[in-house]
Amino acid sequence: MTHSLRVIFAGTPEFAAAALAAIHEAGFPVPLVLTQPDRPAGRGMKLQASAVKRYALERGMAVAQPPSLRRAGKYPVEAVAALDLLHATPHDVMVVAAYGLLLPQEVLELPRHGCINIHASLLPRWRGAAPIHRAIEAGDAETGVTLMQMDAGLDTGAMLHEARVAIAPDDTTATLHDKLAAAGARLVVDALVELERTGALAATPQPADGVTYAEKIGKHEAALDWRKPAAALARQVRAFDPFPGGAGTLDGATLKLWAADAVPGRDDAAPGTIVDIGPDGVVIACGEGALRVTQLQKPGGKRLPAREFLAGAPLAVGQRFAPADAA
């Protein structure tokens, strides 16, 4: 099936590529794709194209990679060229998903039907850069995807559609990301079909109550504070997989802790102390309960199940991880 609604797409990572693929496969014409410039990545730090760029080029779509869209910003020449291209490209709506660049008012007002953003939370909860991580870290039972009509604020636009997704007890940011990417892809296609059929989407202003912000994840957040309850640390480990991971410092070496669950603890063990070691994992005392770590990684090594890790890097009951503020 083909459609007449012309969609300019703006996005960068895999989350966005899933939406672009769904839009393209549904038969909507995509005259232009915007994505971030190629970035150094990997061990060799070679320039790599974004997931969106790779998908678009494989299917013969036109791609633009401006470093900015602000006429008065750091890259005015590139921004003006990109804006001229947008003005010259006939389209009806822009779909934005994890693009990574601010859209000036000029761009927001350019499409006949405005700009629709795919956001990975149930707004107004978890506005901002890291909604998937923060939902898991906070212990939310569910999250979802919201389509919103973009305005000049940070994820403050009126809501158009939403899809709810349960957070499983073993979900990591990686697994939940994939669920939300698939949900967002389905949601945006349904919305575009409705927009083409009816000419408008019903918009509901976001409520003033329940607003929270998902701050960008920093590498420093990997350090586990053993004084916290084990349940909170288990959520932190899941939330920070694949980035930045959980981390603990033992005898001066930083170990990455990739999978863990909360288990009953011992009252006589100081937080951070290894209280048990077995094939099922390394059990570490916490402020409340204990954390059983089932997947670890030593510096320069690979992430391994506890049994394999212990075969090459023996640990001992009584060893103690350094406090987070001393690591």
UniProtKB/Swiss-Prot annotation:
The keyword Metal-binding does not apply. One of its GO terms (molecular function) is methionyl-tRNA formyltransferase activity. InterPro entries: Fmt (IPR005794), Formyl_trans_C (IPR005793), Formyl_trans_C_sf (IPR037022), Formyl_transf_N (IPR002376), Formyl_transf_N_sf (IPR036477), Formyl_transferase-like_C_sf (IPR011034), GART_AS (IPR001555), Met-tRNA-FMT_C (IPR044135). (6S)-5,6,7,8-tetrahydrofolate binds at residues 121-124. Signal peptide: none annotated. Gene3D superfamilies: Formyl transferase, C-terminal domain, Formyl transferase, N-terminal domain. It is an enzyme of class 2 (transferase). GO terms for cellular component: cytosol. It holds the Pfam family Formyl_trans_C. The keyword Protein biosynthesis applies. Its EC number is 2.1.2.9. Keywords: Protein biosynthesis, Transferase. Coiled coil: none annotated. CDD domains: FMT_core_Met-tRNA-FMT_N, Met_tRNA_FMT_C. It catalyses: L-methionyl-tRNA(fMet) + (6R)-10-formyltetrahydrofolate = N-formyl-L-methionyl-tRNA(fMet) + (6S)-5,6,7,8-tetrahydrofolate + H(+). Belongs to the Fmt family. HAMAP family: Formyl_trans. PANTHER family: METHIONYL-TRNA FORMYLTRANSFERASE, METHIONYL-TRNA FORMYLTRANSFERASE, MITOCHONDRIAL. Attaches a formyl group to the free amino group of methionyl-tRNA(fMet). The formyl group appears to play a dual role in the initiator identity of N-formylmethionyl-tRNA by promoting its recognition by IF2 and preventing the misappropriation of this tRNA by the elongation apparatus. This is Methionyl-tRNA formyltransferase. It comes from Burkholderia pseudomallei (strain 1106a). The lineage of its organism: Bacteria, Pseudomonadati, Pseudomonadota, Betaproteobacteria, Burkholderiales.
